C-alpha cells in the first residue's frame, strides 16, 4: 500500500487511494501510519457484518456493532482520515439495525 500511494503522488495521478479494513482500530492504524509516512490521503472503507446470521455467529447485538463503529470512526477522524462505513450482507440486514448504525456513523463524521 505504501508503494501504491507513493506512486500515486509521484505520478500526480488524479485518483484517490482507498483501503478497506474491519471497523477496528487495529485495522485502521496501519492505514493511518501510511498516510503519516507518505503524506498521501487514503480513504478508509471500514466494514462490519450486520445481518442476523452474522450477529448470531459472532454473538453480537446492536450495541456491540455501535461500539466498533464509534471507536473506529473516532480514531479515523482524530487521525484526519476520511471514513466510509460499509455493512456486509446488507441485503439480509434489518432496517432497525442499519438505521442507527448509519445515523451514528454520519453524526461522527463518516461520509
Model segments located where?
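Alpha/beta enzyme core
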Residues: 2-12, 25-111
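A glycine-rich helix N-cap at a beta->alpha junction
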Residues: 17-21
Amino acid at each position: 500500500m505504501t508503494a501504491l500511494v507513493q506512486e500515486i503522488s509521484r505520478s500526480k495521478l488524479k485518483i484517490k487511494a482507498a483501503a478497506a479494513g474491519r471497523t477496528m482500530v487495529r485495522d485502521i492504524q496501519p492505514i493511518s501510519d501510511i498516510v503519516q509516512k507518505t503524506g498521501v490521503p487514503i480513504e478508509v472503507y471500514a466494514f462490519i457484518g450486520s445481518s442476523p446470521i452474522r450477529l448470531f455467529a459472532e454473538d453480537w447485538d446492536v450495541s456491540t456493532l455501535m461500539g466498533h463503529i464509534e471507536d473506529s470512526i473516532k480514531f479515523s477522524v482524530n487521525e484526519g482520515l476520511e471514513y466510509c462505513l460499509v455493512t456486509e450482507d446488507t441485503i439480509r440486514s434489518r432496517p432497525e439495525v442499519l438505521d442507527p448504525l448509519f445515523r451514528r456513523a454520519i453524526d461522527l463524521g463518516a461520509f
